[in-house]
Amino acid sequence: MTDLSQHTPMMQQYFKLKHQHPDQLMFYRMGDFYELFYEDAKKAAKLLDITLTARGQSGGKAIPMAGIPFHSAEGYLAKLVKLGESVAICEQIGDPATSKGPVERQVVRIITPGTVSDEALLDERRDNLLAAILGDERLFGLAVLDITSGRFSVQEIKGWETLLAELERLNPAELLIPDDWPQGLPAEKRRGVRRRAPWDFDRDSAHKSLCQQFGTQDLKGFGCQNLTLAIGAAGCLLAYAKETQRTALPHLRSLRHDRLDDTVILDGASRRNLELDINLSGGRENTLQSVVDRCQTAMASRLMSRWLNRPLRDRAVLEARQESIACLLERYRFENLQPQLKEIGDLERILARIGLRNARPRDLARLRDALAALPDLQNAMTELEAPHLQALATTIGTYPELAELLAKAIIDNPPAVIRDGGVIKTGYDAELDELQALSENAGQFLMDLEAREKARTGLPNLKVGYNRIHGYFIELPRVQAEQAPADYIRRQTLKGAERFITPELKAFEDKALSAQSRALAREKALYEELLERLIGHLAPLQDSASALAELDVLANLAERALNLDLNRPRFVEHTCLHIEQGRHPVVEQVLETPFVANDLALDADTRMLVITGPNMGGKSTYMRQTALIVLLAHIGSFVPAARCELSLVDRIFTRIGSSDDLAGGRSTFMVEMSETANILHNATDKSLVLMDEVGRGTSTFDGLSLAWAAAEDLARTRAFTLFATHYFELTVLPESQPAVANVHLNATEHNERIVFLHHVLPGPASQSYGLAVAQLAGVPTPVIQRAREHLKRLETTSLPHEMPSQQSGKPASPMQSDLFASLPHPVIDELSRINPDDISPRQALDLLYAWKMRV
């Protein structure tokens, strides 16, 4: 810390506070501005595009300074938070009029990306999460907190791979890790990673602080007593939240134990490829959520996003949701609920801000309106006979006393902040009414005084006025000032006038100004009392908000089922996936032509479909729609199919499309192989696997070998697999693997032009139509003509020079010995001695890389 004796008293105060918050930008309140100094000022000037100036000198050097008006701070804070910065808000808490030396200041709040609660700093349709991890290479404890809702969960996870996939699903704004962990760990590649002292993760201290927070003797009631690593992480989160909020956290009431085994697991690649709530460009258009989410409230949209990203395997829960949707569809009952739900607003986040004691007047007005809408909503729910809907109705309840309290207390359209008053209704508090009357009647008193003084003095140019610096005054032009009565006391001299005060005006000033400040203080005290009364009802109100969000999602899914022609899927015990007339829910909405629906049948006898057909023929769409139908079924939704019957799945894997991972130093092919390896290691006989064009990122023979081996391994695993390929050699797989079948997407060629029919038919495709697709894409005609010449030559000589020709329109022989027989290389001898059935996919991959180094 710098030698404070060299600096001014105010800068000494600044350095002491800044020393306590070295990692945050310090917003230091000075009058109507937040000022930043030294390195903070330089950084803020660059990030916020504000002017960097200098303020005098301290310690013999000019002080770099940048400032922003306090009333427009929100916009600047939002920008800093989006950039991943944290800000310490330092306010004046002393009275400048009575302070000896610098006004007393203290940090009242720390705003970080993971702990923001202000409405203006949040995306209303996305959760804003804070996470912490503790553990080693084998087992990790993960804790997750949403301070804007009060949701607090823990789980224990095996291995980095599973942990990173879970972090990708959660996408926390901040991630806390122990400071004694080695540098360069995989988790540190994520945004918002902050290292915390190891003792913040102490498990005994964490257990004690969590029990204290929840008012319990132990954590057994939450089912996480033995999750010691996760409890250590949760303790760190709780301490961090208290440190940043500088207040109690009454809205954090419980801890939930999440279990991966309860969910359908999707890795990061699968989530990206299926474009659940973010498309491949990073936007939200044309995603699954953009089609199925028409929720009335923001809190329901956030719940919908959580459902989509964390499908369930609990059949009882899923069927209860289905039953609720069916009930809401009967006689279009959802239409009676949705207008009422729209009145509820974002109750979840409003209640969190009340718990944090930073709720604004408009939050209380929205809560008032929400509570007023509950009785009508309850009446609309009385006819809903589905058990789950009845349980939600019971949880929602009504709060007539709170509704009446807020209706009496808060004006219809309150200001944004309590700072200047004008929030509490007249008639709510007699003392406030009296003080406000004194202040409001000042105008009439001054008019009466001016008229009386004009009459008494005979001076027609006399005026009575007020300004914030000098208070009330009587003003006379300079030429008439000498005629002022003896009881006029000179207060201020202006260029062309003199200002006076009288004992009567001074007495009124003392009373009026005192009344104004006392009225504001009284109003703020009443507002704080309101918050305290609401905090006393926080637990049932939060339960109601959760139930209302779920009701909104279910009503939304009923509306979507009606308007998107979705039907109820049926879960069965025996292993199968049967879809009749399935459709892609997103593609269907953006097409200008009717979508071609297709069937799919996988069961105990058929576990894999090898899908062939032309590029643009619809293979990827067919695969993705299958995954989306299965996923929608596993959130309890109806699905885009005429009929769907399925068993529960444990994972959904997709290997569809790849691009270079430049940041990670991985080529497209390496990304593809990493995704393939993940699938081969983790798929089970209850998984759904989509494999699109495996092996296309390398040479023909390498790619074919890998695709073949991967398909065989998945066939042995008996995972439900859709395997799209342009390697026609793979269409002979059903001969050696009885659980494999061929299907193809059909097309036809007319006058050298291709027409895609998009129907899925049994059997392999007859040709690939590659040149026709190239022509359709606009490849120049001379290039297409030259390509046809090359194709004719290759069809007679094959690859690379001397391979036997094949009949046009028939698949090449799939036997690898034939394909490689003409290549004079030692690797072929080794390959001929290997039985593919005796080696694992991993061994095949290692051999392939070794051979490639030698070729």
From Swiss-Prot:
SUPFAM superfamilies: DNA repair protein MutS, domain I (SSF55271), DNA repair protein MutS, domain II (SSF53150), DNA repair protein MutS, domain III (SSF48334), P-loop containing nucleoside triphosphate hydrolases (SSF52540). Keywords: ATP-binding, DNA damage, DNA repair, DNA-binding, Nucleotide-binding. Pfam families: MutS_I (PF01624), MutS_II (PF05188), MutS_III (PF05192), MutS_IV (PF05190), MutS_V (PF00488). This is DNA mismatch repair protein MutS. ATP binds at G613, P614, N615, M616, G617, G618, K619, S620. Signal peptide: none annotated. InterPro entries: DNA_mismatch_repair_MutS (IPR005748), DNA_mismatch_repair_MutS-lik_N (IPR007695), DNA_mismatch_repair_MutS/MSH (IPR017261), DNA_mismatch_repair_MutS_C (IPR000432), DNA_mismatch_repair_MutS_clamp (IPR007861), DNA_mismatch_repair_MutS_core (IPR007696), DNA_mismatch_repair_MutS_N (IPR016151), DNA_mismatch_repair_MutS_sf (IPR036187). GO terms for biological process: mismatch repair. GO terms for cellular component: cytosol. This protein is involved in the repair of mismatches in DNA. It is possible that it carries out the mismatch recognition step. This protein has a weak ATPase activity. Belongs to the DNA mismatch repair MutS family. The keyword DNA damage applies. It comes from the Bacteria. GO terms for molecular function: ATP binding; ATP-dependent DNA damage sensor activity; damaged DNA binding; mismatched DNA binding. CDD domains: ABC_MutS1. Residues 796-816 are annotated as: Disordered.
